[in-house]
């Protein structure tokens, strides 16, 4: 009488097939994880740039106190969260441009404050060599890699 169950060869073949399928799926999992981080990077850059532009518009329309020679861009990212006083308002209400500074999803150290995970470009620095300065004209990621589209992350 034949015993019921799997033979050793059937188990080995099954394990081998599962191993091949798993190894074929791993690159797809990594690719999807990278795609998700890149999507988050796009969204974070858009949020920050929109807040910087809103601050600049408020400054240009006379709602933000500026000194002679100021560019009208925020002095740092934290100002966008902390807010500035609307000098045209009789009640001196505060204007806020961000709820919080988003983290750079490509930044490797989770212990660093979110505002410090971004590279800052001042209004006076050229696009080819972004440098921090008296204001924040633009932000960029400090990641060195290239995206799935072949463009360096720093150029996004």
Identify the role of each PLM range.
Residues 19, 26, 34, 91-94, ...:
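Preference for short coil/turn "hinge" residues that link or interrupt alpha-helices
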């Amino acid at each position: 009488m034949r015993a019921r169950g799997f033979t050793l060869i059937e188990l080995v073949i099954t394990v081998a097939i599962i191993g091949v399928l798993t190894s074929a799926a791993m690159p797809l999992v990594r690719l999807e994880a990278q795609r998700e981080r890149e999507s988050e990077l796009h969204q974070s850059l858009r949020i920050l740039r929109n807040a910087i532009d809103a601050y600049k518009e408020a400054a240009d329309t006379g709602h933000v106190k500026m000194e002679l020679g100021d560019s009208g861009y925020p002095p740092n990212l934290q100002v966008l969260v902390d807010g500035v006083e609307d000098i045209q308002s009789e009640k001196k209400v505060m204007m806020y441009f961000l709820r919080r500074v988003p983290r750079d999803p490509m930044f490797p150290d989770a212990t660093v404050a979110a505002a410090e995970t971004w590279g800052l470009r001042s209004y006076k620095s050229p696009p080819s060599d972004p440098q921090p300065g008296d204001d924040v004209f633009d932000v960029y990621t400090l990641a060195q890699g290239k995206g799935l589209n072949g463009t360096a992350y720093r150029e996004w």
